[in-house]
Amino acid sequence: MSRKISKESKKVNISSSLESEDISLETTVPTDDISSSEEREGKVRITRQLIERKELLHNIQLLKIELSQKTMMIDNLKVDYLTKIEELEEKLNDALHQKQLLTLRLDNQLAFQQKDASKYQELMKQEMETILLRQKQLEETNLQLREKAGDVRRNLRDFELTEEQYIKLKAFPEDQLSIPEYVSVRFYELVNPLRKEICELQVKKNILAEELSTNKNQLKQLTETYEEDRKNYSEVQIRCQRLALELADTKQLIQQGDYRQENYDKVKSERDALEQEVIELRRKHEILEASHMIQTKERSELSKEVVTLEQTVTLLQKDKEYLNRQNMELSVRCAHEEDRLERLQAQLEESKKAREEMYEKYVASRDHYKTEYENKLHDELEQIRLKTNQEIDQLRNASREMYERENRNLREARDNAVAEKERAVMAEKDALEKHDQLLDRYRELQLSTESKVTEFLHQSKLKSFESERVQLLQEETARNLTQCQLECEKYQKKLEVLTKEFYSLQASSEKRITELQAQNSEHQARLDIYEKLEKELDEIIMQTAEIENEDEAERVLFSYGYGANVPTTAKRRLKQSVHLARRVLQLEKQNSLILKDLEHRKDQVTQLSQELDRANSLLNQTQQPYRYLIESVRQRDSKIDSLTESIAQLEKDVSNLNKEKSALLQTKNQMALDLEQLLNHREELAAMKQILVKMHSKHSENSLLLTKTEPKHVTENQKSKTLNVPKEHEDNIFTPKPTLFTKKEAPEWSKKQKMKT
């Protein structure tokens, strides 16, 4: 609004100055013909008109000065804007040049990339062709390998060998063997030791089962004897206690009569004093217990607080480390931001300095133009004064000529003034339009600068928001990290506890394993001895079974100590006899089968001989080429028959092997279950071990001593595990407890016995 008012005032001043200039032009016109009668009136008019004219001239000169100043300002603005326009044009030219360079670079890069792409496509095509060729080759090799695998599968149906076949094949080197022969050899090498082991394990299992049954029977007998002895011992102990109590009661009754009479008063006073002491001690005890409870509670609370404080200290240490890391990171960021801020401040100071320099230049130019204007004004005023003085003189001299000239030239002057006024108005309008255009440009530039400033402010706000968001994310991550650290510590503690438990369990298990291994080694040594004895007996019996004469068989048996006290069982003898009977039956079956095979083979031989005769007769009758074909067909038929028979036999063998394998697996699983059951019955085995040791050490003694000593040892072991028996009961020697003289009444059972007596 202030700018608009100043513009309007300037317009008014300019118009007034132009009007005054027109008037001054009218007054300056000289007059030649003036009458003498109007001289006095003309003097008065001339003086007024001169004053007005001088004022108008002064105003016009002021307006001219202002107009010159404004023109100078406009010229300066034009120069500034022209320089800015030139700079912008230079920037535009630079940008266009850069654009052209970038387009050229882009075209070059596109050309290079197209060349590279074409080369890469060619390489890919070549690689694809090579890959396809390789794929075809691999497919062909795959088909060949599949055919070979099919042949190998067909050949690998029957790979079970006898010992003779294995020995024959083993004699050949591995390179000369075919794949099915090599596989059958390897299968025999792997399966044969397993079969032997299974047989041995079955034998061991049977032996252990027999021993277990015998040990169980012995254990039952020993437990029965132990229970009987324990019952007898408890009855004797109860009787002894009753007798000791009766003796103590009788002694008390004897001594009470004399003692009460002599020391009744002393005992009563002592009792009262002791009762008072007991009451005081109880009070003190209650007070101390209460204080002890309070102290224990305080101690537990303090221990809890100490634990919590230790946890807080550890957490604070970790927080401190984390905060130190964050502080270091933030300090680095702060240093970067400070460097950036210093750069921006330096740029801002440079811009301020440039602004101040421009302002100083503007002020200096304004002062310079002001001084020049004042000097010009002073010179013009002096010139005006001189002119006014000269004109006054001229007016005094030519006052008469004034009115005539004025009257003559008034109309012409008016016309000229109007024309000049119109010209001035047009010039003013042009100047105002240019001024408005410049103002519009100035405003546009100002708006563009303001928009840029707002954009920069908006960017700074966005960056501040992003920094706040990053800080929030950092805080959340810090919280999550602390929680994770706490969980880690908990899991570490749990892991330490579990590792301690694991090590303790491992140590206990190792101890137990060593004990069991020692026991197992002892049992194994004994079992080996028994097995050797039984094997010797089996060999002797088998030798006697092979001998046909009974007398010679009895001699062999007696020579090896038959009839002596060899530690064998009835079950073992039954097994041996059953084994011999089975062998006899097997031999009979084999004999009958061999006879049947012989008869069948004889029949086959007769049939084949007949067929051979017929075929030979036919062949002799036929011509040569047909004979050759028939022989080839016969050979093929014979080969086919032999191959089919061998295939059938091999399939049967495979099925038998599968059955044997399943049976062996079942026996293996059963043995594993039996072993687990035996391991579960460790306590029974330990007791059996002790019994066997005692039996071995005291084998020469009588059976009565064994029955007495063994329950003692068993009872001692069980007492050491379960009960803590006092020393008075050791070695069946009872030492009664010391008698205590009390003022209590006798028990009821002693009173009843007294009443009965």
Curated annotation (Swiss-Prot):
Induction: By progesterone.
Chief location of this protein within or outside the cell: cytoplasm
Entry keyword set: Ciliopathy, Cytoplasm, Cytoskeleton, Disease variant, Immunity, Joubert syndrome, Nucleus, Secreted
Region (Mediates modulation of Th2 dominant cytokine production): 1-419
Compositionally skewed regions (Basic and acidic residues) per UniProt: 742-751
Tissue: Expressed at highest levels in testis. Moderate expression is detected in spleen, thymus, prostate, ovary, small intestine, and colon. Expressed in the first trimester pregnancy decidua. Localized to extravillous cytotrophoblast (at protein level). Also found in syncytiotrophoblast and part of the villous cytotrophoblast. Isoform 1 is expressed in first trimester and term villous trophoblast; trophoblast cells can additionally express other isoforms. Overexpressed in solid tumors from stomach and uterus and in cells from ovary, cervical, breast, lymphoma and leukemia cancer.
Positions of region (Disordered): 712-757
GO biological process, one term: mitotic metaphase chromosome alignment
Gene Ontology molecular function, alphabetical: interleukin-4 receptor binding
GO cellular component entries: centriolar satellite; centrosome; ciliary basal body; cytoplasm; extracellular space; microtubule organizing center; nucleus
Annotated region (Sufficient for NK inhibitory function), positions in chain: 1-184
Location(s) in or outside the cell: Cytoplasm, Cytoskeleton, Microtubule organizing center, Centrosome; Cytoplasm; Secreted
Region (Required for interaction with PCM1): 271-363
Related illness: May be associated with microcephaly.
Summary of subunit composition and partner proteins: Isoform 1 interacts with PCM1, BBS4 and CEP63. Interacts with IL4R. Interacts with CFAP53.
Misc. remarks from the entry: During normal pregnancy, the production is continuously increasing until the 37th gestational week and is followed by a sharp decrease after the 41st week of gestation. In pathological pregnancies, urinary levels fail to increase. Candidate for the diagnosis of threatened premature pregnancy termination.
Function: Plays a role in ciliogenesis.
Protein name: Progesterone-induced-blocking factor 1
Organism: Homo sapiens (Human)
